[in-house]
């Protein structure tokens, strides 16, 4: 009876906050993948709009702040980041890079003093398509649902998502969209865009991982999917947990114990226990996993189909794009960041590899733990509550807080629908 009484009130509050209708819900077609105890605990959060929206808003802000911080050094290695940052007195990294920082070409909009609203980023564009999927297809979307939303609204894709989008628009649907002429199946693309599935399944990591796998299956297999499952589970766990080691250890339960991704993360947990200084742990990580057996960090694909003159195959086989290596880098930043928002995203930025993706991922996890209300204003204010999107249903200038409120609305539906249908 308590659920029946509270459900309409909380839904009404969230619907008013989000400015959208909750009537698009469709019943779930699959088992809940969450225990009754997990669902009841999740319901205690999602039925408290103020507290839940703060958590979701914190995760969205953490994502966007981490991306903005690290975008100027996207795809750089630790040594190059340090060298350029030292040129302008910005090492160790403790804030946004200053306006005189020499970063990647076109990085000026992300530099402090220039940053005025969050510029578009492919990680976020694809997360927003998950939000649109929840809006248009309901809270139990299939891979085909997500793919059809991509087909309809995704303006561009990079690396694995670019190949998958090309396949989808030729009528090749998941899972074949991931396996057809796609050399990037084990890359970071799933890992970098699935935070939202953890946000809408708070404290239900198996459910979050399952939803993330549906999303990642458009463009990834194997380690690429395991990374997506791990990140979504971590965000889900972070909604109730603040200790990074606990989050990482528990998130490992939702990927195969013998997969490479799990091995990399377990190694980082071991190095963290061994070394007080993050740089020593990084040295172990980079030595063991940062290179191919021939000592190189990147190589060309042998298959003539993947000619780099073709736009969707313009990226080579670089270690820094692997889900496994970047998952380990995220784990390192989370452990040595010790739950401190600024320290965690700054460490992630100094570590490098697929730098912006990783800082965004750890920002989303810590942001979910602490909530928007605990993120220092220095980090939030340059975003001006604005994300500039190329996704038409979102709008060219979207309110970040409104995005968070709509996400929270669907999170309520995800939990309440399963609590009713799968008690």
Predicted feature descriptions by range:
Residues 73-111, 124, 147:
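Active-site-surrounding "flap" and adjacent substrate/cofactor-binding loops of secreted or lumenal enzymes
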Residues 65, 69, 76-89, 220-223, ...:
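Catalytic phosphate/nucleotide-handling subdomain of diverse soluble enzymes
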Residues 43-47, 166-170, 174-185, 194-204, ...:
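Accessory "access/gating" subregions that flank catalytic or transport cores
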Residues 1-9:
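Bacterial N-terminal signal peptides that target proteins for export
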Residues 31-38, 262, 269-319, 369-423:
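Acidic, carboxylate-rich catalytic segments that either coordinate divalent cations
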Residues 48-70:
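Mature N-terminal segment immediately following signal peptide/propeptide cleavage
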Residues 116-221, 225-229, 240:
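Active-site cavity-forming subdomains of large catalytic enzyme subunits
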């Amino acid at each position: 009876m308590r659920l029946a009484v509270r459900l309409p009130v909380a839904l009404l509050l969230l619907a008013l906050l989000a400015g959208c209708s909750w009537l698009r819900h469709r019943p779930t077609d699959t088992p809940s993948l969450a225990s009754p105890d997990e669902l009841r605990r999740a319901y205690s959060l999602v039925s408290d709009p103020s507290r839940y929206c703060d958590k979701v808003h914190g995760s969205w802000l953490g994502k966007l702040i981490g991306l903005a911080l690290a975008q100027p050094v996207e795809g750089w290695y630790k040594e190059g980041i340090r060298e350029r940052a030292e040129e302008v007195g910005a090492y160790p990294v403790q804030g946004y890079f200053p306006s005189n920082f020499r970063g990647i070409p076109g990085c000026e909009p992300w530099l402090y003093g220039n940053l005025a609203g969050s510029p578009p980023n492919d990680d976020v564009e694809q997360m927003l398509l998950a939000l649109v999927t929840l809006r248009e297809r309901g809270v139990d979307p299939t891979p085909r649902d997500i793919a059809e939303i991509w087909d309809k609204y995704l303006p561009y894709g990079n690396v694995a998502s670019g190949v998958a989008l090309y396949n989808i628009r030729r009528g090749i649907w998941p899972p074949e969209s991931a396996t057809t002429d796609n050399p990037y199946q084990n890359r970071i693309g799933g890992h970098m865009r699935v935070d939202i599935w953890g946000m809408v399944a708070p404290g239900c990591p198996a459910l979050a991982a399952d939803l993330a796998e549906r999303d990642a299956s458009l463009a990834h297999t194997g380690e690429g999917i395991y990374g997506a499952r791990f990140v979504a589970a971590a965000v889900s766990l972070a909604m109730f947990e603040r200790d990074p080691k606990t989050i990482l250890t528990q998130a490992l339960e939702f990927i195969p114990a013998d997969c490479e991704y799990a091995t990399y993360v377990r190694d980082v947990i071991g190095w963290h226990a061994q070394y007080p200084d993050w740089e020593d742990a990084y040295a172990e990580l980079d030595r063991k996993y940062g290179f191919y057996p021939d000592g190189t960090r990147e190589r060309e694909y042998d298959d003539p189909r993947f000619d780099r003159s073709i736009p969707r195959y313009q990226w080579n086989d670089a270690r820094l794009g692997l889900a496994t290596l970047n998952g380990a880098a995220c784990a390192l930043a989370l452990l040595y960041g010790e739950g401190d928002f600024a320290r965690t995203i700054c460490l992630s930025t100094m570590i490098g590899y697929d730098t912006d993706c990783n800082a965004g991922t750890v920002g989303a996890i810590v942001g979910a733990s602490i909530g928007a209300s605990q993120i220092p204003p220095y980090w939030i204010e340059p975003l001006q509550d604005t994300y500039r999107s190329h996704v038409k249903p979102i709008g060219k200038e979207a309110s970040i807080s409104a995005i968070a409120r709509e996400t929270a609305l669907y999170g309520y539906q995800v939990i309440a629908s399963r609590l009713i249908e799968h008690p």
